[in-house]
């Protein structure tokens, strides 16, 4: 039985929040398909959205533009809804090299990928929650528009067990094998089962904390129990249980056999086309590769690159949209697009890049034409499938504004009373020396500075110059991966250095209350990096500090500068009036620095017997580890944990289990 959403927060809606919540809920109840929440930095947009979710009690998907923001949102939602299902759905690849062919050098690049099994488990948990309950919030990246197993086939493959049902042991084991679970009587881990007499222990693929024990008497299920897979301690009995497939891509045997026949027909047709065009090498290559795949599918039920045959496996027609996470979201679900000015263009761009790579593979005989249907959703398909949508951004794009029409809800007033930064325009001629003196003032009072330049070269030269003149400075650029980026931002907040130089710092989306000055060099150069939207976003980076200030260096005031300054001053005036009316004294934000890397940890553990009662594991010694080293440490601790469990040293195993759990959350936050 699904519970209702229960919002946990010490705060009550304030400022513009109550009005924004009322208007959003009113719009949703009146059937509005699109609404935009225009909320300034630090106005509590996430809290507003959480209130809407709790009040309307509808399954919700939140789309974020990248894993970093998704992790931050997941942590915040976990804290708002500790008693409900808050799930995380991002790409499970630590590394991914798609197969490709370069005709100019006759080079074929094989597909190569490394799957993160912890994130895979969280993806499985997300789809299970969407299928089983209504109090669900799934925080997803644009990975949600990529093909996923067909929900109808996924549901058909599930194994339902109930107390008292008549089923023999061999049938259960056969069904578990069909779900791609493997038998392992020695090491009991996620996605495996073990058999001891008439007892079958199953470790569900979507869980990392508990397992199922099935006790049979002859051919009857006598008891179903949930137990701790490490200590073996029974937690409670259940009257029924559903075992979900180990992967989203599991397919019934009949469907595979049917798909094989359809693939053979397409292969014969394609061979004729290639031979008619005198493409003998391509014809031979295609025949050889496809026959090998068919043989593997016949023997094992799957093959390497089976996703290229997804059209046949899911029973779709040519050109039809692939099944995605959106197919798992109920019809009355709610979609929140966070930082929509970045996320919406991303959705539109995914399909085209994927298409051009696959067309080359098809043309040169590496894949059948049906492989083109293994793709992300097209933008039109996303629009058709998306449920009622709320776009959330400080600077909504043209698309959101057009779709929302007049339904744009402003959230400009901050409950904290914080004002938008003061803006000054200064001449370009002395910008570097002027900036250096401003940096020294901020460093002396333990505040931080962000500087944006137009080019990589300029950012590098400026970093060198500032460093030579005694400033503690770092440079953030596109070659630095997401994980290092989070570490750099964390070090900035901790005061390891005072100045961060970059080209496009506005898309980080992370809270940095310590930043009191944003300096925008060459602000009068019109273009993508100095557009009205970019300027407002960049100025907003200083909006979480009491002494927030933005300096725009330019010899003239461009149209974009004028609009950005005008909009910021309008918001500042509105906040000032609100503060005076209610006698509010602005308060700085005290967001803990660890929050960036935490995923709602206080509420991660359950409150049931034996699981929530132990103390929080101490993992402070691993905080400084790089992502690679952290992943290695998790593997080492897991190996030790299983060794302790096998030696019946359950206390030590449970201690390590808690450490592993904490480190996984840390790893996900920075992956």
Swiss-Prot record:
Residues 26-183 form the Helicase ATP-binding domain. The UvrABC repair system catalyzes the recognition and processing of DNA lesions. A damage recognition complex composed of 2 UvrA and 2 UvrB subunits scans DNA for abnormalities. Upon binding of the UvrA(2)B(2) complex to a putative damaged site, the DNA wraps around one UvrB monomer. DNA wrap is dependent on ATP binding by UvrB and probably causes local melting of the DNA helix, facilitating insertion of UvrB beta-hairpin between the DNA strands. Then UvrB probes one DNA strand for the presence of a lesion. Forms a heterotetramer with UvrA during the search for lesions. Interacts with UvrC in an incision complex. GO terms for molecular function: ATP binding; ATP hydrolysis activity; DNA binding; excinuclease ABC activity; helicase activity. This is UvrABC system protein B. NCBIfam families: PRK05298.1 (NF003673), uvrb (TIGR00631). Keywords: ATP-binding, Cytoplasm, DNA damage, DNA excision, DNA repair, Excision nuclease, Helicase, Hydrolase, Nucleotide-binding, SOS response. Residues 431-593 form the Helicase C-terminal domain. SMART domains: DEXDc (SM00487), HELICc (SM00490). The lineage of its organism: Bacteria, Pseudomonadati, Pseudomonadota, Gammaproteobacteria, Enterobacterales. The beta-hairpin motif is involved in DNA binding. The gene is uvrB. A motif (Beta-hairpin) lies at residues 92-115. One of its GO terms (biological process) is nucleotide-excision repair. It comes from the Bacteria. ATP binds at residues 39-46.
């Amino acid at each position: 039985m699904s519970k209702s959403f229960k919002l946990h927060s010490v705060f009550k809606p304030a400022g513009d929040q109550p009005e924004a919540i009322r208007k959003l809920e009113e719009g949703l109840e009146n059937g509005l398909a699109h609404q935009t929440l225009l909320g300034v930095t630090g106005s509590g947009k996430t809290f507003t959205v959480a209130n809407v979710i709790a009040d309307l009690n509808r399954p919700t998907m939140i789309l974020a533009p990248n894993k970093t923001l998704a992790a931050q949102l997941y942590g915040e939602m976990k804290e708002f809804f500790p008693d409900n299902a808050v799930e995380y759905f991002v790409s499970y690849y630590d590394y991914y090299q798609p197969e490709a062919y370069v005709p100019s050098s006759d080079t074929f690049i094989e597909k190569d990928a490394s799957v993160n099994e912890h994130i895979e488990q969280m993806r499985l948990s997300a789809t299970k929650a969407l299928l089983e309950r209504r109090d669900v919030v799934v925080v997803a990246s644009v990975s949600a528009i990529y093909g996923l197993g067909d929900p109808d086939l996924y549901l058909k493959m599930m194994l339902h067990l109930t107390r008292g049902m008549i089923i023999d042991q061999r049938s259960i084991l056969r069904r578990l094998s069909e779900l791609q679970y493997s038998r392992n009587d020695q090491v009991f881990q996620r996605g495996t089962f073990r058999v001891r007499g008439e007892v079958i222990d199953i470790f569900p693929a979507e869980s990392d904390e508990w397992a199922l024990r099935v006790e049979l008497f002859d051919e009857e299920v006598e008891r179903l129990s949930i137990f701790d897979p490490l200590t073996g301690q029974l937690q409670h009995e259940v009257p029924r249980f559903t075992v979900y497939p180990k992967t989203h891509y599991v397919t019934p045997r009949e469907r595979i056999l049917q798909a094989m026949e359809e693939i053979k027909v397409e292969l014969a047709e394609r061979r004729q086309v290639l031979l008619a065009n005198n493409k003998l090498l391509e014809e031979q290559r295609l025949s050889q590769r496809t026959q090998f795949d068919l043989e593997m599918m016949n023997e094992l039920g799957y093959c390497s690159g089976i996703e290229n045959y997804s059209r046949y496996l899911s029973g779709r027609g040519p050109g039809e949209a692939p099944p995605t996470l959106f197919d798992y979201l109920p019809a009355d679900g709610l979609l929140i697009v966070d930082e929509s000015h970045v996320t919406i263009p991303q959705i539109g761009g995914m399909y085209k890049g994927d298409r051009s790579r696959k067309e080359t593979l098809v043309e040169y005989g590496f894949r059948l034409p049906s492989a083109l249907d293994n793709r992300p959703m097209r933008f039109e398909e996303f629009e058709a499938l998306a449920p009622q949508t709320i776009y959330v951004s400080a600077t909504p794009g043209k698309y959101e504004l057009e779709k929302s029409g007049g339904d744009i809800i402003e959230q400009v007033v901050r409950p904290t009373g914080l004002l938008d930064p003061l803006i000054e325009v200064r001449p370009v001629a002395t910008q570097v020396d002027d900036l250096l003196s401003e940096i020294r003032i901020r460093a002396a009072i333990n505040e931080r500075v962000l500087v944006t330049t137009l080019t990589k070269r300029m950012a590098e030269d400026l970093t060198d110059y500032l460093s030579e003149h005694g400033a503690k400075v770092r440079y953030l650029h596109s070659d630095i991966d997401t994980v290092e980026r989070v570490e750099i931002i964390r070090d900035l907040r901790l005061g390891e250095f005072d100045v961060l130089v970059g080209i496009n710092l506005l898309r980080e989306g992370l809270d940095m209350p310590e930043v009191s000055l944003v300096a925008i060099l060459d602000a009068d150069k019109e273009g993508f990096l100095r557009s009205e939207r970019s300027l407002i976003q960049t100025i907003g980076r200083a909006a979480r500090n009491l002494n927030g200030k933005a300096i725009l260096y330019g010899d003239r005031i461009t149209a974009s500068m004028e609009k950005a300054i005008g909009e910021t001053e309008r918001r500042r005036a509105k906040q000032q009036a609100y503060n005076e009316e209610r006698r509010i004294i602005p308060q700085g934000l005290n967001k803990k620095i660890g929050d960036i890397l935490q995923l709602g940890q206080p509420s991660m553990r359950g409150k049931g017997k034996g699981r929530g009662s132990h103390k929080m594991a101490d993992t402070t010694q691993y905080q400084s580890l790089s992502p690679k080293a952290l992943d290695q440490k998790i593997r080492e601790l897991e190996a030790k944990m299983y060794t302790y469990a096998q030696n019946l040293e359950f206390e030590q195993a449970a201690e390590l289990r808690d450490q592993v759990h904490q480190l996984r959350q840390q790893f996900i936050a920075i992956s």
